[in-house]
UniProtKB/Swiss-Prot annotation:
Keyword Methyltransferase attached: no
Protein name (Swiss-Prot/TrEMBL): NAD(P)H-quinone oxidoreductase subunit 6, chloroplastic
Pfam families, per the entry: Oxidored_q3
Family label: Belongs to the complex I subunit 6 family.
Encoding gene per record: ndhG
Length: 176
């Protein structure tokens, strides 16, 4: 990215100060949740350091992996290990819990039935005549996006569903 000198310097100072303040927050804050959020600020600023050097994909990947996954995992681990001092009584199932589990089970069964009944071999995912790909004109980030939305669409979506289920399970465990 060709930024003018003062804007580039301001961006570096802004991101550097975000890293320093976030690092101080990680070390000095006594609440572990606030420390985890400060770590998220540090990881966010570190990922933005790649943008001035035209590494947009690396910045986006670090943002998704470190801030979106690792920091959320750390927050859930902190929430899970601290326990809740407000909610220590035995949880009795209510009607809402039963309805929710019934709805989730029916959605799960319908998804599994749809997956098993679909003839995956008859689906034409892409045709090369529709894809005019000039390798010299498309950047690496665009090639990764094309492959994720064509060749690897089904595995990408399955992984996202598995991660969503894991996230919901972590939330349920952290609440208890």
């Amino acid at each position: 990215m060709d930024l003018p000198g003062p804007i580039h310097d301001f961006l570096l100072v802004f991101l550097g100060s975000g890293i320093i303040l976030g690092g101080l927050g990680v070390v000095l804050l006594t609440n572990p949740i606030f420390s985890a959020f400060s770590l998220g600020l540090v990881l966010f600023c570190i990922s933005l350091f790649h943008i001035p050097s035209n590494s947009h994909f690396v910045a986006a990947a670090q943002l998704l992996i470190y801030v979106g996954a690792i920091n959320v995992l750390i927050i859930f681990a902190v929430m899970f290990t601290n326990g809740s001092e407000y909610y220590n009584d035995f949880h009795v199932w209510t009607v809402g819990d039963g309805v929710t589990s019934l709805v989730c089970t029916s959605i799960f069964v319908s998804l599994i039935t749809t997956i098993l009944d679909t003839s995956w071999y008859g689906i034409i995912w892409t045709t090369r005549s529709n894809q005019i790909i000039e390798q010299d004109l498309i950047s690496n980030g665009q090639q990764i996006g094309i492959h994720l939305s064509t060749d690897f669409f089904l595995p990408f979506e399955l992984v996202s569903i598995i991660l969503l289920v894991a996230l919901i399970g972590a939330i349920a465990m952290a609440r208890q």
